[in-house]
Design a protein with these regions (language model features):
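Acidic, metal/ion-coordinating pockets
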Residues: 1-126
């Protein structure tokens, strides 16, 4: 549906994670657009699991889209669904990536697509 609608970028949500790695990894590969996740970190090497952001140019305007998911996934869902991943704090992640984006990309506009809920408690980085 999202391909049909012509999405340019998307991000993960907790309901995507609920299906488990096999399903969300397949969904990501089936998308004709990048699924972003600046705060989804692989525990094996501490690199981002998904692309953190995507750059677009429209009518001479440079646009960066930054995507993140709630870091409450470990509180809401069993680890068997997201094993090997860590969900970093959104504010810290935004600050980190905004610095990189501003220095490297020099965008005219930054759009954040964030899937988040209410309050949560985050586990420390393993």
């Amino acid at each position: 549906m999202m391909n049909y609608m012509g999405y340019n970028a998307g991000n993960m949500g907790n309901h995507d994670v609920e299906a488990g790695h096999a399903v969300f990894d397949r969904w990501i590969k089936q998308c004709d657009f990048p699924i972003l996740g600046a705060n989804i970190i692989r525990t094996s090497d501490r690199e981002t699991y998904l692309k953190p952001y995507e750059v677009f140019e429209r009518d001479g305007v440079k646009i960066v889209v930054l995507g993140m998911i709630t870091p409450a996934i470990p509180v809401w869902l069993p680890e068997t669904l997201w094993q090997g991943l860590y969900f970093a704090d959104m504010e810290e992640t935004a600050r980190k990536w905004m610095k990189i984006i501003q220095e490297k990309e020099k965008p005219d506009v930054v759009v954040g697509i964030f899937h988040a809920g209410g309050s949560y408690h985050v586990r420390p980085v393993p």
